């Protein structure tokens, strides 16, 4: 097949690759290459680094256990990872390179705006994509080979019911999010949901990802006197600055991120006390189930320091390995068929792909989602909730 690729050559030539194992292009007789396009530098690196590392660790462990058996033949799993810096042009360039130069047929892309920019390329080249991304229309019948591997706002907004039950004093919500596909859709879903629960939406603001001075936006938000500020879809670097500057302007309320954010990174920027009481999805430091403690030890041994974001960002690799085993094929379409039926273990328990009633296709990962509250500087698990559909 001739790859159809977008012509973003300046970014293409500037892309930096990290390759685990063999550097041969294409699929060697005994190698399955898995492409990763993710931010390994910049404000979103606290997402991208554990995304790459978690995938690499799971593949290394599968290889050490005898590699992946497909119809009696052993295959070694390898990753080819590129840094897109959460810049759309870089994201397009890295995916182009993975498909055309590296010959990968299996991908995991992080970032809604980046995934949306690559939809056509992924679909036309018949590539299986297991992204970590928020964007409207991403999980859709028009993207049959895209299996979203992290809970999205239609799933995670259910935590607002928990808040309403446990903290009835909170009445008004303000939101601040990136000015792109990821931010627009995330806030649209979240604000519609909270309004349905009776909350007042005091303000909705968007920012460019390069912004570091949030005071003008925050002054508009704080003038509306919200009880809580949602920073959904915002990366840790931006969230730290938002919280720091909001506190300096006198905001005393809570913050919430029902996407995913590393609160330790946020606290290093904003100050530990300023993050106290924040609620987050998908980032837990304590208490950890036994299987997560084991993962923590293995991850720390390999990479030198622990990163709790890796817990949920391991999902694409878990899903891929389970589906290949079930499909007994390296055909992306057959692996996709297997993903519709296979139940697999992730670090929080059992997971599968579902959500057909909501999305029109069963391509959204479903599992018991962890939510935490920062208490004494530690992201402490307060609830595990199931999505509103199966």
What are these regions (language model features)?
Residues 243-315, 325, 379-389:
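Extracellular/periplasmic periplasmic-binding protein-like sensory domains
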Residues 35-58, 82-88, 111, 176-184, ...:
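Extracytoplasmic "Venus flytrap"
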Residues 15-26:
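C-terminal segment of classical bacterial N-terminal signal peptides
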Residues 1-12:
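Bacterial N-terminal signal peptides that target proteins for export
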Residues 25-36, 69-78, 164-171:
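Immediate post-signal peptide segment of exported/extracytoplasmic ligand-binding proteins
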Residues 101-204, 254-276:
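Extracytoplasmic ligand/sensor domains, especially the bilobed periplasmic-binding protein
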Residues 301-310, 322-381:
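Segments of small-molecule ligand-sensing domains
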Residues 31, 46-53, 65-140, 149, ...:
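Beta-alpha junction/loop-to-helix N-cap segments that form part of ligand/metal-binding clefts
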């Amino acid at each position: 097949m001739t790859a159809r690729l977008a012509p973003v050559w300046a970014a293409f030539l500037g892309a930096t690759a990290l390759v685990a194992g063999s550097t041969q292009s294409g699929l060697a007789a005994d190698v399955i290459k898995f492409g990763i396009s993710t931010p390994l530098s910049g404000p979103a690196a606290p997402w991208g680094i554990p995304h790459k590392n978690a995938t690499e660790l799971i593949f290394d462990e599968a290889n050490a256990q005898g590699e992946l058996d497909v119809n009696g033949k052993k295959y070694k799993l390898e990753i080819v990872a590129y840094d897109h810096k959460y810049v759309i042009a870089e994201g397009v360039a890295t995916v182009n390179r993975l498909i055309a130069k590296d010959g990968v047929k299996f991908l995991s892309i992080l970032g809604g705006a980046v995934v949306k920019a690559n939809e056509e390329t992924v679909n036309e080249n018949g590539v299986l994509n297991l992204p970590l991304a928020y964007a409207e229309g991403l999980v859709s019948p028009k993207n049959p080979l895209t299996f979203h591997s992290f809970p999205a706002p239609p799933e995670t907004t259910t935590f607002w019911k928990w808040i309403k039950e446990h903290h009835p004093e909170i009445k008004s919500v303000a939101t601040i999010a990136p000015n792109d596909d990821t931010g627009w859709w995330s806030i649209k879903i979240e604000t519609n949901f909270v309004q349905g629960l009776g909350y007042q939406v005091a303000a909705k603001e968007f920012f460019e990802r390069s912004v570091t001075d949030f005071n003008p936006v925050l002054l508009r938000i704080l003038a509306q006197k919200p009880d809580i500020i949602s920073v959904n879809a915002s990366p840790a670097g931006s969230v730290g600055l938002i919280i720091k500057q909001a506190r300096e302007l006198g905001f005393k309320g809570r913050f919430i991120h029902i996407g995913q954010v590393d609160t330790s990174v946020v606290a290093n920027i904003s100050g530990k006390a300023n993050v106290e009481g924040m609620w987050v999805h998908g980032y837990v430091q304590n208490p950890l189930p036994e299987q997560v403690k084991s993962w923590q030890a293995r991850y720390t041994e390999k990479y030198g320091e622990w990163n709790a974001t890796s817990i949920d960002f391991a999902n694409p690799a878990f899903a891929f390995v389970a589906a290949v085993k079930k499909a007994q094929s390296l055909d992306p379409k057959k692996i996709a068929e297997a993903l519709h039926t296979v139940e697999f273990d992730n670090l929080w328990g059992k997971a599968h792909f579902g959500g057909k009633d909501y999305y029109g296709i069963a391509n959204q990962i479903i599992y018991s989602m962890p939510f935490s509250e920062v208490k004494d500087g530690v992201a402490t698990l307060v609830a595990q909730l199931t999505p509103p559909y199966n």
